[in-house]
Amino acid sequence: MKKTKKIAISGAAFAGALLSFGVAGAWADDLTQLPAAPPPPAPPPPPAAPTSPLIAPAITGPLTIQLPPPKYTLGPLGDVYVDGIGSGLYQWQTNPVPNVLPGNNRSAGGLNNGQVFVQKTDGLFQFYAQAGAYAITSLGSPFISTPLATWGANSPAGNLWGWFPQGFAKIAPTDNFSVEGGKLPTLIGAEYTFDFENINIERGLLWNQEPSVSKGGQVNYTRGPLAFSLSFTDGFDSGVWNWLTGSATYTLNPANSFEFVAGGNLGSTHINTLRTPILQNNSSIYNLIYTYNADPWIIQPYFQATHVPANFGLYGPSASTFGGALLVNYDVGAGFNLGGRLEYIGTTGNNNLLYGPGSGAFSLTFTPTYQYRYFFTRGEVSFVKANSVADGLAFGSNGTATTQTRLLVETGILF
């Protein structure tokens, strides 16, 4: 049997223990009365990412204007922002069509952007002005150099939109309602007019069927996730006001949006120039556009249909186009992006909207981009394959080639 060890405690020791316990307990009670040490201060919140106060230019990406933009206070006019771009372009292509426009040779290069953007973006009265030089390059179409596009109303390009391609005044009595008028960017399509605004350097086959700049007026209204715009303009910059265009956009969340656009000529227009092609300017056009934009992806598929009604006193039988495109950009990081576009367009009817009645075309474009602050550079390779072409209306010196490959390099500053 295990023995239990007896512990003897004297009265004095027991009293001392009680005294010690009492002192310790009282000391503990005193500690509980002391104020608690204040918690360490919370770290300051990270600075908010700058948001763009700019009206325009609209930029899909991956190129970005550095924020905050330069701002100047001009007395009673208030705060005015000034931005701009300067860039050069070199292009090499197979099967050029040299007899369409001067300089449309196997290779071309030079200044393709030298523009300044000035705008006031708050208050009741606002405005946007874009001025300078630009070139236009789009898939399957002749390259329009800066001198042809910008200078001289008698140039073969018809001067396109001149040295002042876009600019408008805007009245905004509330945050969700505004009216604007002037030389407006079109509501139609998923690609913008100038190359720096888009994922790719060249605009696509579908863009070739769309108006780019129109003179007229536009009303804008937003309510919650819905945004509406309605414009009355001269369509393909014809100088004849007979185009009505509307757009409706639903923003599901910051990453996802859906847009429907419809527009068309309410009458007929007899003008036929490079910037106002007679068939397209007498057409109606429809878009369905979905946009996903959340790092590291931009994904934008869209569908487009156009129709030109018959007018035998003006241009002849009817014709239509139908097509779709997928625009994609992936942000690799450290300033590098990889962009691409896949598209197809087909035509029906007995009039020529592409490379002859009933012709079609497929395209593939790849555009790597690097931007460090204001400096950017990007390259591009594109391929177009046409089908069911009419002799003399496709590629090459005789207009009978059915493919065209292009290599492009662009570099400059965007500030």
PLM regions and their residue ranges:
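N-terminal periplasmic/intermembrane-space "pro-region" immediately following the signal or transit peptide
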Residues: K2-P98, F415
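Outer-membrane beta-barrel pore domains
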Residues: I55-A56, V100-G103, P147-N159, F258-S268, ...
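Outer-membrane beta-barrel channels and translocator barrels
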Residues: G75-L77, T121-F125, T174-N176, T186, ...
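Outer-envelope exported proteins of Gram-negative bacteria
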Residues: D79-I85, Y128-Y134, E180-G182, S231, ...
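Residues on the lipid-exposed face of transmembrane beta-strands in outer-membrane beta-barrel proteins
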Residues: G84, L111-K120, Q166-I171, G181, ...
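Structural signature of outer-membrane beta-barrel domains
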Residues: L89-Q93, F127, Y134-S138, T186-G189, ...
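Surface-exposed coil loops of outer-membrane beta-barrel proteins
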Residues: Q93-R106, T137-Q166, I171-N253, E259-L266, ...
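Glycine- and aromatic-enriched membrane insertion/assembly motifs of diderm outer-membrane
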Residues: N104-T137, D331, F336-N337
